[in-house]
Amino acid sequence: MKKNTKWILENKTNYEKIFENKREKKLDFIIEDLIENRNLSLDTNFDFKLFDLKDMDIATQRIFEAIKSNQKIYIYGDYDVDGITSVSLLYLALSELGANVDYYIPLRDEGYGLNKEAIQTLKNENTDLVISVDCGINSIEEINFANELNLDFIITDHHEITGDIPKALAVINSKREENIYSFKYLAGVGTAFMLVYALYTQMNKLNDLEKYLDIVAIGTVADIVPLVSDNRKFVKRGLKLLNTTKWIGIKQLLRKIFPDNWDTKEYFAYDVGYIIAPIFNAAGRLEDAKQAVSLFVEEDGFKCLSIIDKLLENNIERKNMERGMSILEMSVTEIEKKQLYNKNLILVANKSFHHGVIGIVASKILDKYYKPTIIMEIKENEGVATASCRSIDGVNIVECLNS
């Protein structure tokens, strides 16, 4: 058992509810008891309403205006799986509404989040509106720069708010205190889905929403957010769609990795988290995350097969890097030699580390020692370092770094 494991005492079991659910859903008592003790729900209906998130009304009004006037919309995303699925979801949904839309995902070397060079590039391409997904909540300078260019910005993000809210046209984040919606742990793709939900509700297209939930499920599982409340509902409903997914690229990928039963097997969060998501993640780590987005949005089956071959090749390269695991081995050796496990925070830095896998290594170090962990790639020529951080329950590493 892992040291410092957090024990959670069971709730006082509501046996009246258990008997009711057993009658209605024919559940085993043990399963129902586990569901009750974990505060889970069997309900798969979402808990949100149209404008439960602050600025949702402003965002949808501006998007409808852009669609009506055929204005150029760019979706700006992150290069991890949450960002990839967020971009794909919003691109597909806006395209269906008739929007003039494209997407931009920075290369990993550009760094996480918004950057001024990219914003200038989008402005030069006569972009009228940028919608960020899975990034932007702390990009105050970048949004100020966009305002100077008269470039409208809608931020959709789920990360911690570390200071003032950027002065974008609209800022949608489940962690905003002004929200009516009380659940604060949406993934980026869940936040993007809330925007799509609001748009489609106003267009009387709610029946067209369900088909997107497999994309939402992949991003939600990959981002390791708590699978409770609406996150659990996204995943539960989305996993059931994978057998009959309407997205040609996803269908081709599932056929490739589950050749015997892709269309009949029952999919679990494990399949997404450990088999499907790493294939998309490898694109952002080693190549260009736009490859992964193209698999979601491409309608030509032959092109999809070519994209899949490249993604699988990237994933093999990623696995080989991890198997060699020089970074993990070097990190563990340094931790043990210097007894860093006795400190409140573990920090390991080296110029030979590869930025594409330091996040994976940080997660493995966290699992091994259960201490907040920072793994850094030192870029000697630039005089900076790139880091990935992982933390334990009860320690907000963002607040620690800002203090």
Task: Report each predicted region and the residues it spans.
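Short gly/pro/ser/thr-enriched loop/turn and capping motifs at secondary-structure boundaries
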Residues: 110-111, 139, 159-164, 178-179, ...
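Generic detector of well-ordered alpha-helical packing
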Residues: 79-83, 135, 158-159, 174, ...
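Catalytic PLP-binding core of fold-type I/II PLP enzymes
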Residues: 143-162, 224, 233
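Hydrophobic helix-and-loop "lid/oligomerization" segment in the mid-to-C-terminal part
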Residues: 2, 10-129, 148-149, 200-403
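Generic beta-sheet signal
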Residues: 104, 133, 156-158, 172-174, ...
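Phosphate/diphosphate-binding loops
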Residues: 129, 133-145, 152, 401-402
